[in-house]
């Protein structure tokens, strides 16, 4: 993915997050709480790093363009909402009834967010960005994400 566009990189991450949700569902069905907790911790770190790198690359560019600003602001607010859910989940007994209910809400909101990005925001932004800009933003995202993963793991 050396020359992948920002949208390719973000979609790849979204697909990995969907796979983590599927693995968590499998672990829950198997009543494997230890595996579920590991997968959830992995999801938290991944999603936190993804959001930060996305905001530093694509969203920063979109916020600087009047015709894209509103969509970027909306997505930033959704990132904050997911972050708030993750904080609330940290305060609940892992895999308890309240935790499972809050997790289901967070999952629904997150899946809505990435679907909205892929189906609405990315196509709109792609019309405004050149192929060179998309590639440059993809490289910036790829550069920022490892640092953000490290930071997210340290916070966890």
Feature names for model-found ranges:
Residues 1-156:
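Small-residue-biased structural context
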